[in-house]
Amino acid sequence: MASGRAGSAARNAESHKCFSLLFYRAVRDLKPVWMLEDMRTMEAFYLEDDAGQRIFSPSEALLYAIVHDHQAYAQYLLTRYGEAALAEPGERFCCCPSSAPHLTMAVRYDRRYILGLILQESRRVPGYARADGRFRTPLHLACELLRPEAVIMLLGSGACASAQDHDGFTPLDVVLEKLRDSSVLDGEEARRCLDHLIMFMPKVHFKLKEVLGKTPEVWSKVLGEETYKYLAGQSPAPLAVSTMQTILQQLSPDTFPASLSELPIPSCLKPLGLPVSPRDQQRV
């Protein structure tokens, strides 16, 4: 009897593994949305007795869509299922620990269009992606990976620039470490991340502030004299920075980034890399 149950469980596990691979490949190959939804919900594809394991949830399907940049499927899942698409995935999905796994995955894979869709939908989900100090936030990750476009999208959508991880590091701390250790190749991206963070931080709080004061000769070279003095608390924000900080405080996250793009100010004052590229728009 026991051996029979064990054999049945093994067959169920194997069948689920096979279907998972089929579904994974279908999303990877950018199959039509209707086909993917038929696969995801059709019970004929499943042999398990456990109804809870019969289908991939919208949340799990969205993770596949993010990984393979299936923009149309991601848009469908978020539009059709809303909050359910942003729910925690099941235990069978091994994601990086995060309070917002879908945002984190979109940042990690640099899926800017899907990131924008998730941010738009997440505004309707109370408490979504709220920093709790246990994990690094998606903004921490965007800074770690030097993704300035993701940084500005997250900040404009209400991400907290001063959120701390379990070590007390803010996204600004992450960028400063990157700048200190950066090569010529990634220094420009790190600098853009820093500039974005500063514009959304009228009050600068970060763990490395004391370190900046101890080695001014190093940090003034890395940051430039004006930025160094501002971050070290030795001078107020430069006029252009102060102006943008004031302007950005007036913008609603609900209308970002369109509200920023439409501001009647010189383009040189606007952040680079505002989403979404024309190529991405055409792909959906």
Residue ranges and their predicted role:
Residues 2-18, 26-28, 167, 174-284:
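Cullin-RING E3 adaptor/co-adaptor recruitment helices
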Residues 14-26, 50-63, 87-104, 128-138, ...:
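Ankyrin-repeat boundary/"N-cap" motif
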Residues 122-146, 258-268:
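Eukaryotic modular interaction domains in large regulatory/scaffold proteins
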Residues 40-49, 76-89, 116-126, 152-160, ...:
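Ankyrin repeat domain, specifically the short helix-to-loop turn at the C-terminus of the second helix
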Residues 1-77:
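N-terminal segments that cap or nucleate solenoid repeat domains
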